Swiss-Prot record:
Name of the featured protein: Cell division protein ZipA
UniProt family annotation: Belongs to the ZipA family.
Any matching Pfam family: ZipA_C
Transmembrane region(s): 5-25
NCBIfam families found in the cross-reference section: septum_zipA (TIGR02205)
Any Gene Ontology CC annotation: plasma membrane
Length: 243
């Protein structure tokens, strides 16, 4: 028998022994590990996405604490039934910028649910998707909201069945870009609405940092939105096919 044949037989025997050893030692250990994992693994707590962060009796803590009002929204089953018109729903979940304002109650006061609903109707907002209020493009509701308004308390929605008992420290207004119109035009729709809501509710307008919204901040936001609109109008760079 040649040396090559003996070498092949030796390799085959070693391979068989190795496979048998792996199977013998790994099978019981794997089974025990699976049983142990199954017994020790604690039940997972089901977590729902949220529309806004929980707030205390102080004014809101800024844009990072109010979930882009869009990215952590709590879905209300009644607001998402198949086949129903969902007024205020964005055509797409994509967004790249959010402008946030608040109307907060004055010290030692709260905003009453009934008053909020009346003020929202007076300023042209409608109750819709996610059980919050929206300003829509007149005649084109399918284009989605220009901006929306929610409670700063979880889950952010307005429970109309118990609206008379509702008392909250503030409401949030959020403009999510891209909007169904230019960013600057959308801002010019939102700002007077927020100011009017504050007037009707005897509240104060705050920016995303909990500061009173002043002229300087308003001018800065307008500049930001002009720059955003210019950026959106820049055509993409496409290489010439000849090159």
């Amino acid at each position: 028998m040649s040396d090559v044949t003996l070498l092949r037989i030796g390799i085959a025997i070693v391979g068989i022994l190795f496979v048998a050893a792996v199977f013998f030692f790994s099978t019981p250990k794997t089974s025990a590990h699976r049983v142990r994992t199954k017994k020790e693994e604690p039940p997972r707590e089901r977590r729902e996405p949220m529309l806004s962060t929980e707030a205390d009796n102080s004014p809101p803590q800024g844009v990072d604490e109010v979930p882009a009002s869009v990215s952590q929204q709590q879905v209300n089953p009644e607001a998402n039934k198949p086949g129903e018109v969902q007024l205020g729903k964005r055509p797409t979940n994509h967004f790249d910028k959010i402008i946030l304002l608040f109307v907060a109650a004055k010290a030692e006061h709260t905003l009453r649910g009934e008053d909020i609903v009346v003020a929202a109707e007076k300023t042209g907002m409608i109750f819709g998707y996610m059980n919050v209020f929206h300003r829509l493009v007149e005649g084109y509701p399918e284009h989605g909201p220009i901006f929306s308004m929610a409670s700063i308390l979880k889950p952010g929605s307005f429970d109309m069945a118990n609206i008379r008992e509702m008392q909250i420290p503030a409401i949030s207004f959020f403009l999510t870009l891209p909007a169904p119109m230019t960013a600057l035009d959308a801002w010019e729709k939102m700002l007077p609405t927020v100011q009017r809501m504050a007037e009707l509710l005897d509240g104060v307008v705050l920016d995303e940092s909990r500061n009173a919204l002043g002229r300087q901040r308003i001018a800065h936001i307008r500049d930001e939105l002009r720059a955003y609109d210019r950026q959106q109008q820049v055509p993409p760079l496409i290489k010439n096919s000849r090159w």
